């Protein structure tokens, strides 16, 4: 079986999201914007473009058009001084903005941002490897550029603001755990740093809820020597839907005592356009010798219909695993309606039922045939090695399997059907008898808008109090309320 005709759209990895927005709803009611008085400062006016600009669409298009924000102007700063000046000006005139790096930031709550200024940060596109083996990363860098630079130096990094899951988290923890400091622009243009030594309270909050406080301009990350000389064993296995129960049983066996810290498992469910049946691709990556990785592949290969094995460089994993189909998921423009949750186990009976229902749904709704389901089963040793209160990331004990459904379509006639189907199945997967957890836990970068905020940021009252305090301190007027906003009062958590 070659490249398959199955994935018309695949989920994005959402691996380096730095989104910040302004939706000062209460503030704008008190101090409404007066467009007749808006005249950009001369220092930045040449960097601001309206819809008549030929490149306006290119510079404002986002990965998903589902409940997306809209823009009247785009601002492309070249220096942090220009960014600072513009923020001071926009906040003073109560203008609404959204900051964009890669444009993969997904949250239906961004729909509240309409007729705004898009701050396109593509000019902050640099990676600098330091003598101490840290990487200084501009916020405009795409993750592919980052990993190429780091890998060329014989180093590696976990695959920030929402946490940062990745295949190497068993060895190195989350991407946000590798963060050492950031430079941040606040709502009024003030530029500050945050680290364990400077603004440590803000640094704590950035690592798990960072879209709420400002615009990250630059980040400094720790890197590590490349594992196994930079080579990773990868196996792509293809299964028909009648193998789903066995696939889940084996995966549960692998995770029961703790998944090998060097092993990562990804699964994709999608409709084969030729057979009109669900096909499942399982990708195994072992960050070690081929012979050790193959021991895990042999658990699955006897009942797979196709197997492809490779030794890949770390920098090749995002583009050459899963038959090289993942880059196609970065296509911009379609509606991508996501539902997600974390589970302790993968209940075989529930997944068999889902697979049958998913196939029936896609056949009945061909306009949504590009939809997919993804499961990321990554090791958690590095994640759990840090204390629960190490950062604002709340799921260190609830991160065995991260499930993400991606409803993909371009015709809104199927919007309600897609939304209802995946919301219903998210709730079924979240039932304790299926998930193995007593509550709903959701990785923030994959969240929709119908989950309780505690599912994203943690159920502990001390977390609510600490996050709300940070919100009031660093974003007192709610200019960064577009992306799963932290409440400005503790009562808002309920």
Predicted regions and their residues:
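Soluble FAD-dependent oxygen oxidases
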Residues: 2-3, 13, 18-494
């Amino acid at each position: 079986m070659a490249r398959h005709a199955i994935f018309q759209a695949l989920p994005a990895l959402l691996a380096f999201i730095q989104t910040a927005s302004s939706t000062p709803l209460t503030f704008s009611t008190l101090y409404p914007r007066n467009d007749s008085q808006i005249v950009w400062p001369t220092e930045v006016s040449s960097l601001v473009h309206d819809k008549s600009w030929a490149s306006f669409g290119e510079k404002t298009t986002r990965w998903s058009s589902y409940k997306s924000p809209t823009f009247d102007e785009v601002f492309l700063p070249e220096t942090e001084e220009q960014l600072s000046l513009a923020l001071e000006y926009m906040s003073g005139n109560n203008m609404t903005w959204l900051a964009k790096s890669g444009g993969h930031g997904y949250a239906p709550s961004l729909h509240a941002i309409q007729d705004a200024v898009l701050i396109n940060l593509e000019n902050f596109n640099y990676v600098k490897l330091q003598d101490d083996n840290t990487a200084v990363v501009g916020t405009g860098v795409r993750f592919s550029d980052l990993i190429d630079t780091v890998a060329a130096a014989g180093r590696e990094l976990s695959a920030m603001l929402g946490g940062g899951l990745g295949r190497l988290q068993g060895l190195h923890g989350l991407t946000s755990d590798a963060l050492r400091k950031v430079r941040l622009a606040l709502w009024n243009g003030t530029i500050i740093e945050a680290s364990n030594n400077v603004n440590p309270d803000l640094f704590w909050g950035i690592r798990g809820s960072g879209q709420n406080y400002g615009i990250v301009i630059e980040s400094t990350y720790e890197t590590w020597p490349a594992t196994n000389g930079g080579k990773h064993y990868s196996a792509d296995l293809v299964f028909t839907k009648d193998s789903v129960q066995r696939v889940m049983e084996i995966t549960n066996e692998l995770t029961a005592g703790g998944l090998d810290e060097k092993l990562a498992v990804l699964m994709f469910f999608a409709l084969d356009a030729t057979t009109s049946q669900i096909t499942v691709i399982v990708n195994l990556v072992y960050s070690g010798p081929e012979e050790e990785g193959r021991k895990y592949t042999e658990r699955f290969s006897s009942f797979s219909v196709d197997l492809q094995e490779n030794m890949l460089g770390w920098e090749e994993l995002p583009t050459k695993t899963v038959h090289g189909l993942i880059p196609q998921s970065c296509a911009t423009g379609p509606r991508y309606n996501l539902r997600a949750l974390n589970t302790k186990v993968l209940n075989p009976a529930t997944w068999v039922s889902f697979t049958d229902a998913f196939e029936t749904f896609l056949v009945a709704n061909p306009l949504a045939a590009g939809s997919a389901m993804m499961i990321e089963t990554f090791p958690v040793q590095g994640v759990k090695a840090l204390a629960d209160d190490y950062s604002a990331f709340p799921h260190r004990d609830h991160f065995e399997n991260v499930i993400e459904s991606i409803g993909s379509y371009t015709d809104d006639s199927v919007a309600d059907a897609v939304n209802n189907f995946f919301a219903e199945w998210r709730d079924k997967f979240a039932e304790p008898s299926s998930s193995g957890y007593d509550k709903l836990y959701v990785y923030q970068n994959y969240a929709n808008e119908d989950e309780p905020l505690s599912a994203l940021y943690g159920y502990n009252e001390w977390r609510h109090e600490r996050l709300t305090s940070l919100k009031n301190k660093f974003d007192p007027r709610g200019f960064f309320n577009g992306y799963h906003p932290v409440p400005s009062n503790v009562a808002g958590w309920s």
